[in-house]
């Protein structure tokens, strides 16, 4: 179908009964992005979070009213209350909103309203969706299409995880963790992979999770496009069930769009792109490390070409892409008691994500010692993937573990960081160093652990990034 249809800009009149929007958990990455877009549309935005942060401060500077802590009176003037999946039904603000008969909606419902009046491009998948969303939004921006985007991470070039554009495209990271991606009605959907995560919301069944992705893809119109990574076994297995136009990508020979001649030079990837329906290929340099990011770039390339972006713009955009915060982000070079080291931070909290980054680091820094500092995220994930974590983390030259970031969960016997330490030790390849108090990690690294020219990578989706930033005090002047 012709995608040159011009969709009307979302304006206040589309939700004319709504003036005041309250976000419970406004500091979360997904929530804050939607709040920022709505602020820029002229709505009165307020919200609460359990702690002050750079995100809440940024929104306050933009004009949002921020409450630190939850209280019933916070929602009394709201026309609608938006909640994230992390907010319990017994939250005092949620209970008060229901008592006052104020509509309470999920984050994805508000995102769906933003998407309703635009050409929606939704990115889903267990891993890689933040980077893929960022690459896609960047290519559309480079092409002058001025998209609106809502991303689960900070797009470095924009300095934000959201932006209201004047164009008619909306690029959004979707969330499969709580099934809320079923609420979206995009025109193009990307699925990067399907891994066994968040199964508690899918009856504990991987097959049910895969069926959930099929349902998400069937929200596309019959003339929409599903962009699917055929290299992923889970995605490949659902292909026969997807009753929408499909374009696959990957390294596999049967992919519609393939990356060939892939090589890593330093922290950049070089590869050629070839499509099964074309005779010629074109060469790409991606300003990110790792084969997993080559796959993410292929998805963005397909979307760009589907929307008519010329190849030179795509090639230039990928070469100049500035990355996403907390995705193998280089904090800088530091001085310590035994020499110097490079410090990186990555959001990876699943074995597959961590392995991809470690592979890229070992390739990009061949011959240098890799020191990983890992904060497990959720007791359930640590329990369910204990052996996988142990296998992946055992390849490090040096490994530091700290206690599990609970993310609201109660402790589970056999699923804390000490249990993970024992499981890794059993592999016999690396002797993990357990440091319970995060405040002690930097002193131990600086004085006892690091050797000259080490590469340090902080992994985790919790608050380990705060520890990585503490290393900034040791940075040397460039």
From Swiss-Prot:
Subcellular location: Cytoplasm
Gene3D superfamilies, A to Z: Mur ligase, C-terminal domain, Mur-like, catalytic domain, NAD(P)-binding Rossmann-like Domain
Reactions catalysed, as given in the entry: UDP-N-acetyl-alpha-D-muramate + L-alanine + ATP = UDP-N-acetyl-alpha-D-muramoyl-L-alanine + ADP + phosphate + H(+)
Cellular-component GO terms for this entry: cytoplasm
Keyword check for Ligase: yes
Top EC group: ligase
GO MF: ATP binding; UDP-N-acetylmuramate-L-alanine ligase activity
Primary role: Cell wall formation.
Protein name in the entry: UDP-N-acetylmuramate--L-alanine ligase
Organism: Dichelobacter nodosus (strain VCS1703A)
Gene responsible for this protein: murC
């Amino acid at each position: 179908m012709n995608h040159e249809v011009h969709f009307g800009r979302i304006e206040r009149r589309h939700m004319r009964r709504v003036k005041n929007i309250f976000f419970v958990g406004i500091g979360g990455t997904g929530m804050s992005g939607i709040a920022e877009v709505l602020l820029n549309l002229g709505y009165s935005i307020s919200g609460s979070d359990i702690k002050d942060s750079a995100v809440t401060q940024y929104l306050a500077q933009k004009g949002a009213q921020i409450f630190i802590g939850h209280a019933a009176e916070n929602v009394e003037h709201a026309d609608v209350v938006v909640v994230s999946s992390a907010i319990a039904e017994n939250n005092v603000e949620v209970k008060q909103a229901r008592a006052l008969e104020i509509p309470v909606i999920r984050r994805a419902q508000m995102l769906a309203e933003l998407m309703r009046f635009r050409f929606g491009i939704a990115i889903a998948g267990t891993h890689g969706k933040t980077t893929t969303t960022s690459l896609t939004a960047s290519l559309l921006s480079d092409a002058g299409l001025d998209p609106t985007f809502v991303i689960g991470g900070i797009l470095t070039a924009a300095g934000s995880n959201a932006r209201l554009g004047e164009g008619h495209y909306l690029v959004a990271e979707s969330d499969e963790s709580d099934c809320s991606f079923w609420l979206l009605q995009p025109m193009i959907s990307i699925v990067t992979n399907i891994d066994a995560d968040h199964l508690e919301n899918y009856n504990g069944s991987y097959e049910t999770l895969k069926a959930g992705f099929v349902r998400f893809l069937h929200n596309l119109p019959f003339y929409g496009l599903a962009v699917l990574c055929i290299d992923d076994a889970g995605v490949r297995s659902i292909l026969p069930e997807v009753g929408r136009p499909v374009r696959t990508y990957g390294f596999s020979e049967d992919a519609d769009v393939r990356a060939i001649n892939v090589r890593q030079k330093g922290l950049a990837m070089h590869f050629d792109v070839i499509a099964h329906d074309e005779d010629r290929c074109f060469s790409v340099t991606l300003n990110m490390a790792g084969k997993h990011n080559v796959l993410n770039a292929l998805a963005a390339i397909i979307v760009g070409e589907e929307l008519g972006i010329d190849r030179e713009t795509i090639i230039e955009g990928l070469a100049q892409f500035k990355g996403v915060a907390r995705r193998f982000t280089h904090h800088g070079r530091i001085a310590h008691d035994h020499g110097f080291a490079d410090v990186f931070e990555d959001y990876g909290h699943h074995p597959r994500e961590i392995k991809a980054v470690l592979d890229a680091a070992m390739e990009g820094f061949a011959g240098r010692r890799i020191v990983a500092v890992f904060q497990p995220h959720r007791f359930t994930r640590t329990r369910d993937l204990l052996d996988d974590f142990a296998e992946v983390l055992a390849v490090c030259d040096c490994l530091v573990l700290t206690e599990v970031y609970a993310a609201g969960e109660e402790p589970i016997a056999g699923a804390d960081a000490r249990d993970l330490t024992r499981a890794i030790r059993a592999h016999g390849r690396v002797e993990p160093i357990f440091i319970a108090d995060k405040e002690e990690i930097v002193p131990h690294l600086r004085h006892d652990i690091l050797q000259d020219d080490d590469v340090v990578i902080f992994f985790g989706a919790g608050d380990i990034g705060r520890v990585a930033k503490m290393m900034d005090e040791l940075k040397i002047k460039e």
